[in-house]
C-alpha cells in the first residue's frame, strides 16, 4: 500500500451555519423543558479553491441552542478561521 500524499494546506474562504428544525410527533418532556422539534446546525466550509466540506454542531438543549450556536459560529469562530492557512488537522 502506497503512503498517502502530504496534505495541502486548507485555507477557509467562507464559513456558514444552517439551522434546521424537524417537528416531532410527540413532544419530549425533560427537566430542561419540552421539545416540540429536533434542531440541527449544519456547517459549510468552503476553501479558497472552491472545495466544500460539511459538518454539524450539537444543539439539542436548550430550545434556542441551535440559533445561539449558529450565531457563535458565524460571528466569533468564522472570523478566526477565514483567511488563515491550516497545514493539517492537528
PLM segments and residue spans:
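Metal- or metallocofactor-binding catalytic centers and their adjacent structured scaffolds
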Residues: 7, 46-90
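Structured beta-strand/loop patches that form or line metal/cofactor-binding pockets in enzymes
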Residues: 2-54, 58-62
